A protein has these predicted regions:
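Short polar catalytic/cofactor-binding loops
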Residues: 11-15
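Acyl-thioester C-C bond-transforming condensing/cleaving domain
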Residues: 1-5, 17-47, 62-66, 73-141
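A glycine-/small-polar-enriched, mobile loop at the entrance of the PLP active site in fold-type I
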Residues: 55-63
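Short glycine-rich phosphate-binding loop at a beta-alpha junction
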Residues: 49-56, 114
Length: 141
């Protein structure tokens, strides 16, 4: 039997601006609101059917650190048995999360998964809080 991965819905948060109305909203809260809303809109899929959550995040530190995917599972009201992981591929993190969930479905490892992405461009400075580039690589053009 061949498994096909199917996207049943897609949603996102509003896009904020620097010092705009979204200032002070934590990225884990924002991502959890999106996942919770996704589950509420799709009542044919129950939270106990979700077998994995893969969260893309280019800078998983500060308020987006500490395995933010687990925080999103808890804050969105998913069962604590739902595993989660964070993928860092910089600008391609959320797309890689989607690829990983679809691959897990197509290989038969899971039947239902959520891929998501989160990035608070204003709470993490460019390069992160403590960039420590390897000296030899930093010298290369």
């Amino acid at each position: 039997m061949e498994n096909k991965a199917v996207i049943i819905d897609a949603t996102r948060s509003p896009i904020g601006i620097k010092n705009g109305e979204m200032v002070g909203i934590r990225p884990d809260d924002l991502a959890a609101q999106v996942v919770k809303g996704l589950m509420e809109r799709n009542n044919t899929v129950t939270s106990d059917q979700v077998e994995d959550l893969v969260m893309g995040c280019a800078f998983p530190e500060g308020p987006q650190g500490m395995l933010i995917g687990r925080y999103v599972v808890a804050l969105a009201g998913l069962p604590q048995t739902v595993p989660a992981k964070v993928v860092n591929r910089f600008c391609g993190s959320a797309m890689d999360a989607l690829h990983q969930v679809s691959t897990a479905i197509e290989s038969g490892d899971i039947e239902v998964g959520i891929s998501a992405g989160v990035e608070d461009m204003f709470s993490i400075p460019p390069g992160g809080f403590a960039p420590d580039f390897h000296p030899e690589l930093a010298e290369q053009e």
